[in-house]
Amino acid sequence: MLHRLLLLIFSCSMACAGDIYQKNQSMGKAESIKPFDHGVEIKTAEGTLIATVFSPTIIKMHFTKKSRESDTLSYAKRHDLQPSKAFKANESSDAYRIETDSLILSISKNPVRIRFSTKSGILINEDEPAFGTSWIGEEVTTYKKLISDEKFIGMGEKTGGLNRRGEGFTHWNTDYFGYPTNADPIYMSTPFYIGLHESQGAKVMYGIFMDNSYKSHFNFGASNDRFSSFTAEDGDMVYYFIYHTTVPGIIESYTSITGRITLPPLWSLGFQQCRYSYYPDKEVLRIAETFREKKIPADVIYLDIHYMDKYKIFTWNQDRFPDPKGMISTLKQKGFNTAVIIDPGIKVEKGYSAYEQGVKQNLFLKYPDATDYTGQVWPGWCHFPDFTNPDTRTWWGNSFKDLVDVGIRGFWNDMNEPATWGQRFPDLVEFSFEGLKGTHRRGHNVYGMQMARATFEGTKDLLKGERPFILTRAGFSGVQRYSAVWTGDNVSSDDHMMLGIRMLSSLGIAGVPYVGMDIGGFSGNPSKELFARWISIGAFAPLSRAHVCVDNKDQEPWSFGERVEDIARNYLNLRYMMLPYIYSSFHEASQSGMPIWRSLAIEYPFDSKIYDGRYQHQFTIGKGLMIAPVNSVQEFTKVYFPGSQPWYDFYSDSKYAPGTEDHVDAPLEKLPAFVQGGSIIPMQSIIQHTGEKSSDTLFVHVYAANSGVTNQQIYHDDGLTYSYEKGAYSHMNIIYDAGKKNITFEAPKGNYKTHHNVIAILLHGFDEVPKGMNINGTSTKVEKRSVSFMKALSNFDPLGGPAREGFMNVQAIHIPYPKAKTSIQW
């Protein structure tokens, strides 16, 4: 009897286990095929595929178990993105085919599998034949056949190497103080990557963006040699497939989906000084005065959480800051803009205005029983605004009025992963999703992005034509439309500095160009050498900001002794000299999505040496200025010079052959930097802040090329308002034709008049510079001139510093700032 009872129990347990077991289900045989104006809908017993053409280079693949009209809300894509009818379609017995001007999508019928190829039939990307797109319960995965030589780049704010092959990553925004250099996930999610491989002798590249905000997982051949894959733990499988013949083309297509930056205020491109925290007001003013006394250029000072009354947002601590408006006005007179931190948590406190309004207007995230969710952060127990509710976004934006009225122009969104003590935000918490409803599982990754959106839209409206500056820690694909991003609470170490370099490069590939890291490291205390090296590198970052944790040693540029102060001053002076080049690069980013800080993989994706651990940290600012970072203890390094044009040492004009590797000196005061032949780099005179006018001369540095045609845009506007949208800008194209020995300044477009009246053209590396040149057919004299980008360090130490400034001898001509096309011939 006992034996029978045990057998019955065992049989029941096995039956239950069988019910629990969820087998992988992939898309099976096509049961119906329905073409529509923009693509095709294919149904199987397992699910439905809707393929939609958006452009010759972009096709959206949507796999769902629901109807075609099911919820397709996306915060990542532009709201005005429209599908296309420009394609041909045909059906055979075994496949359905869509052909655009750039690529071919073939969908096999039994089973439904995806293959992308070029117009000439070369394979771009295809499903793993056995799995395709599959479900295990609610989890959905697309498996792609792994090609032997395939490399993967992108993924945004991720640790690891430049080439993601052999690695796996999770997208789930995570507050990770002092994250290790191999941590994953951290603060931000951008589920986009670029694949690179050779097929039939052709170099092929493509991009895949998975538009699903649930927790997701990407596998680039980690623990297997059969497939790459991307997985969402719930929701539909929606991905955009992008094909182009260049990485810049893929980035441009990707950002046509997710959007591009609007031009930030020019002052936000100056140096930014932050710490946790500057207070009281006298200390803030002392920091500002010290920058000016020491002639170290800077534009922004931050106030961290100690400016608030008991950490409550939209309040001031009256003891520490009795007159915020007066302090901010004084800072403004000294050329500083002020940025303040704003976290999402709103303290549960009777009489606190933000709390009372949020409860009364029903604006907070909720439990399923309709009570407001409460979690602990800096102020104590808090409610959290539901930024997927349009009413909340409007209220939030209006809540900045008092800050705007006292003169705040920078708004720093932190703790918006969202972060709470305990790191266990309950999954059952409900989000509005524009009235469609959903849980924290879907809303978590877009929370920070929608907070940044609400902050940007609200402050933009309040500033009435003036540009706000927004900085966020957390985000999702598309966050670049609203905010700059920094890489969170990093550590004062060489490894973290080098990791930050890789992450900025990867963020740029993922369509997020306005990025930076905490110079010097947020946690820990950097050595003198580490801070010197870090600020040299950080001076080239799109967002150049120093920051440090509470109770840590000071990390202002003068905090490490005279030598480091001189190094910091030199590199920040250089940043301000380069603002015409940097701002023009920001304009390019706003038009094409191209990053300012660029991995070498953008221009040289199939050069295997750039993925070498020795060279993967090299990057360019714009297209032509290459930085070869080194750590704080290296005094020389090996540099790789890619491409087909010569490279010139930025400080001496020493010439390096393309395709070579060479050892170069890297003393602490000289970060290795090189300019590619054909590059055109506009600069201005040194200023202490962007509110100062530089001299009336714009210095245009041209570097000799072996052959070919290159160009450089120079873009100006008022740097403060949105008047450029109505034509108040100056946009000039400079073309250098090495073969024809010609430099052409095209007539500027736009109706903004720059204060520059003269252009000094400085020729670097021209072996046969004529004694005279023709400007629009009229002969002009060429002058010899010495130029230097760095001043000698004070109190020269013959064992540790340069004996003098590094001067270069160049040829120079001067022309009036062009109003019409101007051609220079030699």
Language-model regions, residue ranges each:
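Bacterial Sec-dependent N-terminal signal peptides
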Residues: 1-23
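Generic structural signal for short, solvent-exposed loop/turn connectors between secondary structure elements
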Residues: 1-7, 40, 45-48, 407, ...
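Catalytic-domain carbohydrate-binding cleft regions of carbohydrate-active enzymes
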Residues: 18-24, 122-670, 675-676
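Flexible coil/linker segments and helix-coil junctions enriched in charged and small residues
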Residues: 794-799, 805
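N-terminal accessory segment at the very beginning of proteins
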Residues: 16-258, 264-267, 274-276, 281-283, ...
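Hydrophobic alpha-helical segments and their boundary regions
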Residues: 6-7, 91, 359, 507, ...
